[in-house]
Amino acid sequence: MALPNLWGLYNLRSSPFFQATLRADSQTTPLHLFVGRQRERQLLLTTIGSSTSSRQAVAGRPGIGKTTLVQTVKADAQTEGYWSSDEIIPISARGAGAEGTSAHLLGQLLSGVYDAVLANCPTAAGPEVEAGQQLVRSIRLRGGGFTVSAFGFGAGGSQSESVATPPGALLLEGPRVLRDLLRYTIGQGARGIVLHLNNLENLSEADASRAADLLRGIRDQALLHDGLHLIVVGTTDAVRTVVQTHTQVRSVFSNPLVLEPLGLADVEQLLANRYEALQLDQSRPWHSPVETAVVVRLYELFRGDLRGMLKALEDGITALLGLTSAGAEVAPVGLEDLLLTLLQRNQAELQEQLGDTAWERLLAWAQVDAAAVQTQAQLVELWQVKQPSVSQTLQQLIEAGAVEALPRRGREAIQYLMTGTARLAF
């Protein structure tokens, strides 16, 4: 007996409100669902195509589609003869151990290049590939990751698979091995390798400064090799800190490309593309699970935060469809029903997550104006508490997804705004 599929009521195989990153190798979240951003897409591709080596940065608020844009750019570049892979390389800046060193970041870049070589040329062989395999295997074994066989990757973890590579070998040999792998790539007819560095979304200010130091530490060793094209992705403040703090790094990076939210028409097209791709019965039309007014209102509340908007649609519609019995087709969910469901749900979740004090302060903010921008000085006056208490509460609200800090403007005070998730609770 098949399990019930609530989305089948709209002739859809599964939820169209997924948040998974679009990938070239995925049948459920394929890249052809990407919409909009043609200008930004062309700018990134032109920079890659106009140089033997490039370093770019894509910035913007959380949830507006930065990662998906870069995944699409990598796929575009691949059709033009560049090598890449769907993997995203994280920049880690926390801790005083291996993960907080330039050597670790160098190892991640080397692993990314090696993965791209194997992804595009599974039969790759030769001294350059063997040297890369040995270093990458050593890196992954020390980090508790995967081992590498002569024919690719495996999930083994035994000591017999280990390679005796001294910890300092990465700093000594890594840059040479990286350069040789890139030369091998060019020798195989590729125009270069495009790597996607991510994980700047949630870096604290201190972590972003540390990441800037790490990037500076490998500038000459790794960033400037012919054939290597890097795209760093993260929030506006994090990206600016990471790539513009040090002159040595800023001088070799293009100015960050700061993304604005997708327009409403593009968001509506994005949803239509998903409905069509998930059509269950090709002999019958699909139906939108929500009325147009729902999309318009949530777009206004979330101000272009697609991640938050899709989650709100998923949560609200799933709750409402759970009350629907299988049978005849159901009408799209209306605005009033969805907003009421999300208000009750978000209120309960935030109250439980925040506790009484932080919830009461968020409520006081909402009673003044849930859409208003606030500074810490304004919140000191509103909440009638001292600045350290305001700072602590804001951190709690940010971690709960109720508030976000807007990008800095020079030396002006940081501005804070309620997220769509919090505004739905009021």
PLM features per residue range, with description:
Residues T46-I193, L197, L203-A206, L228, ...:
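P-loop NTPase nucleotide-binding core
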Residues M1-Q56, D76-T79:
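A short, basic N-terminal segment
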Residues R408-F426:
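Short, cationic-aromatic polyanion-contact patches
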Residues E130-S138, Y275-E329:
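Conserved AAA+ ATPase small/helical "lid" subdomain
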Residues G304, G308-Q378:
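Winged-helix-like regulatory helical subdomains adjacent to P-loop NTPase cores
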Residues Q384-A400, A413:
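Short amphipathic alpha-helical interaction segments
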Residues A2-L12, R176, D180-V295:
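The catalytic "switch" region of P-loop NTPases
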